[in-house]
């Protein structure tokens, strides 16, 4: 009996836990009231059990049961007080967490409680309570807020009940669904989806059951859809959106999508139309060039045979051995060894009308004026550049950089020579340049050789010092052009008058001898053979030559009397 009664008390304790928060003063009083209630319940339960079991039993057992009941009541009172205090503390902590969540988010979910005690919430802890009565908590709106399951249910119900988007029968791409990213609706579990139609009459905007302004979003997306349609379907991408109609129509122009282009670039449709050529060439002048490889829109691509001649633009190609004209070469693609010649037409329909098919044999006439060859020298003069200039076009020639270091050096050297040439022509003459060059050559020739060391160097230096003196002595002794006479010989002296064949003796030892034994040339009189000069005498006048005729006007000296 004693072991079973506390278990019954413990089993009933958690059923009676309060669901509301109270102050510290109210906790004690309220706990006493609950303890009394629990004791009364236990007493009634135990008395009923004992009365049912112990009717034929003696009074002694009843006394013992009463003692046991008193002890169990004391134990249950203490345990219930402890449990009530613990449950109240837990409820206070839970209430604080709920208040924090209520401040952070506006959507607070309040679930209803089945018991009346859970609806009683204690007032503020700072308020003083005089009477042991429980004050109800402030009324909280318990209307169902937007939670995850409720939003999902609302989303599924909106599709069927609230609003329906009318389908558009214009086409598959007329309706688009764009998710709206609105910061006001970011707290919801999903983003509203708006259906937009490109047609003005059928353009309607709809959103899910959110409080955001769906009308403004629908109008904005409708305008955006129109702009997208205009951009896709227009031909000229550079024109503004205001230049087109409201529904994006462009008149008679084609609505096909055009490739991107830069400013100033012309597409195939922008080029002037091609006039059909009526040319025929003899069959013997035609040479097979290749075949029609493919047809792309309004271009015919011709592949050539290996090791064939290279042709330039505007070369006329033929079909059927010269009897039919294919067209002029519009562009050349591919490698130099295996080029592809492009022939342009006005439209693809024109190609079909002329009966041009893939695999047709193409001919050329290299001996006629309709063929343009590639000249390598002219091709090398064309300078291309990979650099991008304004509007993604190639830069002009004056802005092209050199692609090779050697070319850059050659160009700089040529510019340097040109500047030097211009400077020379403007300041100095050709004679001045020649004189400067001659002076530089002489200076380089007069420059002494490198000096040597040792005894050999001393001998060479002595010889070099003696050579200039000898040369200077020879230059200072001028010689007669006709005779190699002594410099002191004077042909206008009286000796020449009386002695025309007189020659002064070689008494001057300063005169250098030309030939050993022959100081003077052979005289033109007497013997024709050379002979030695007569010895010198110590008188002033030498004797006359032995076989010479007497001098004129000097007969008195010969023993004859003077004329009377």
UniProtKB/Swiss-Prot annotation:
The modification Phosphoserine is found at residues 254, 403, 429. Residues 1-29, 108-218, 238-264, 387-489, 538-564 are annotated as: Disordered. The keyword Secreted does not apply. Residues 388-402 have a biased composition (Basic and acidic residues). Gene3D superfamilies: Probable tRNA pseudouridine synthase domain. Its main location: nucleus. Residues 238-249 have a biased composition (Acidic residues). Transmembrane segments: none annotated. One of its GO terms (molecular function) is RNA binding. Residues 468-489, 554-564 have a biased composition (Polar residues). It comes from the Eukaryota. Keywords: Nucleus, Phosphoprotein, Ribosome biogenesis, RNA-binding, rRNA processing. One of its GO terms (biological process) is box H/ACA snoRNP assembly. Residues 146-157, 426-446 have a biased composition (Low complexity). The modification Phosphothreonine is found at residues 250, 427, 432. One of its GO terms (cellular component) is nucleus. It is found in: Nucleus. Residues 538-553 have a biased composition (Pro residues). RNA-binding protein required for the maturation of the box H/ACA small nucleolar ribonucleoprotein (H/ACA snoRNP) complex and ribosome biogenesis. During assembly of the H/ACA snoRNP complex it associates with the complex and dissociates during complex maturation, becoming replaced by Gar1 to yield mature H/ACA snoRNP complex. During assembly of the complex, component of the box H/ACA small nucleolar ribonucleoprotein (H/ACA snoRNP) complex. Belongs to the NAF1 family. This is H/ACA ribonucleoprotein complex non-core subunit NAF1.
């Amino acid at each position: 009996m004693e072991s079973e009664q506390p278990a019954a008390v413990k089993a009933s304790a958690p059923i009676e836990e309060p669901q509301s928060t109270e102050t510290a003063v109210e906790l004690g009083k309220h706990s006493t009231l609950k303890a009394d209630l629990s004791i009364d319940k236990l007493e009634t339960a135990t008395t009923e059990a004992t009365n049912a079991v112990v009717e034929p039993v003696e009074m002694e057992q009843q006394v013992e049961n009463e003692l046991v009941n008193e002890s169990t009541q004391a134990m249950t009172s203490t345990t219930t007080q402890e449990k009530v205090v613990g449950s109240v503390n837990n409820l206070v902590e839970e209430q604080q967490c709920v208040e924090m969540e209520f401040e952070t988010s506006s959507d607070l979910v309040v679930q209803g409680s089945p018991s009346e005690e859970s609806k009683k919430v204690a007032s503020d802890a700072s308020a003083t309570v005089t009477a042991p009565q429980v004050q109800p908590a402030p009324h909280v709106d318990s209307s169902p807020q937007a939670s995850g399951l409720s939003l999902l249910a609302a989303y599924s119900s909106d599709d069927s009940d609230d609003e329906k988007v009318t389908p558009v029968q214009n086409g598959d791409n007329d309706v688009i669904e764009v998710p709206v990213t609105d910061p006001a609706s970011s707290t919801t579990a999903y983003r509203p989806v708006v259906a937009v139609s490109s047609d003005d009459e059928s353009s309607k905007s709809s959103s899910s059951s959110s409080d955001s302004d769906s009308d403004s979003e629908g109008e904005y997306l409708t305008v955006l859809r129109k702009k997208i349609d205009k951009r896709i379907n227009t031909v000229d991408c550079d024109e503004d959106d205001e230049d087109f109609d409201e529904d994006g129509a462009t008149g008679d122009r084609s609505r096909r999508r055009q490739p991107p282009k830069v400013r100033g670039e012309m597409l195939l449709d922008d080029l002037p139309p091609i006039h059909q050529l009526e040319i025929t060439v003899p069959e013997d002048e035609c040479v097979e060039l290749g075949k029609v490889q493919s047809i792309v829109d309004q271009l015919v691509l011709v592949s050539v045979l290996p090791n064939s001649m290279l042709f330039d633009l505007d070369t006329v190609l033929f079909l059927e051995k010269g009897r039919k004209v294919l067209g002029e070469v519009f562009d050349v693609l591919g490698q130099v060894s295996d080029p592809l010649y492009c022939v342009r037409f006005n439209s693809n329909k024109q190609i079909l009308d002329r009966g041009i098919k893939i695999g047709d044999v193409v001919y050329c006439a290299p001996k006629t004026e309709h063929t343009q060859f590639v000249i390598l020298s002219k091709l090398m003069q064309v300078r291309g550049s990979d650099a991008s200039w304004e509007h993604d076009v190639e830069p002009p020639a004056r802005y092209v950089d050199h692609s090779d270091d050697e070319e850059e050096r050659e160009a700089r050297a040529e510019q340097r020579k040109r500047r030097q040439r211009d400077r020379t022509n403007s300041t100095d003459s050709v004679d001045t340049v020649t004189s400067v060059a001659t002076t530089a050559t002489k200076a380089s020739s007069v420059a002494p050789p490198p000096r040597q060391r040792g005894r050999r160097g001393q001998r060479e230096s002595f010889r070099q010092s003696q050579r200039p003196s000898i040369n200077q002595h020879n230059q200072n002794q001028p010689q007669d052009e006709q005779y190699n006479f002594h410099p002191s010989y004077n042909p206008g002296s009286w000796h020449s008058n009386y002695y025309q064949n007189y020659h002064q003796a070689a008494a001057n030892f300063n005169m250098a001898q030309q030939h050993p034994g022959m100081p003077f040339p052979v005289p033109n009189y007497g013997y024709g053979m050379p002979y030695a000069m007569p010895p010198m005498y110590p008188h002033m006048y030498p004797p006359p030559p032995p076989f010479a005729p007497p001098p004129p006007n000097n007969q008195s000296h010969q023993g004859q009397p003077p004329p009377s």
